[in-house]
Amino acid sequence: MSETASPPMPQPTREHQLLKEHAGTWKVACKLYMEPGQPPMEATARETIEMVGEFWTISKYECDMMGMPFVGRAMMGYEPHANRFVSTWVDCMSPVLFHFTGKEKGDTIVMEGEAFSCMTQSVLRHRITEKHISKNERIFEMFATMPDGKEIKMMTNHYRRA
């Protein structure tokens, strides 16, 4: 009977270390672009990010949006075998699971995905960017490509460590 060695345990990569730097509590200045050409609606939020082991983050996002409590959850990680970041998002105002994949481009993580839009009643292509300013500051933006092919900015979140 031969003994088979166990495969080596996966080790965190540089990308996992970048995600680990997001752990903690963040104050968020939100700008929501409800209608193209109109001033954004502004709100403040708080996001708490925790590590799940060495590979994943889970976040809890909370704010008051249009006079109602808004809560969202995100999970984010990096898949070394596919050389890509992966992320999901759910929130209390939508029955849709958002799923994004993407890569790091300089100091920005750029991810894309498709999700059903309750507003347009169609599947829209979404693009999110997260620009790393410092260990204590980052800027997140979300865009959607509308059915006519025009990309619009949906939101900007400016994160500062609390």
Segment roles from a protein language model:
Residues M1-A162:
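Hydrophobic small-molecule pocket/channel-lining residues, especially in calycin-type beta-barrels
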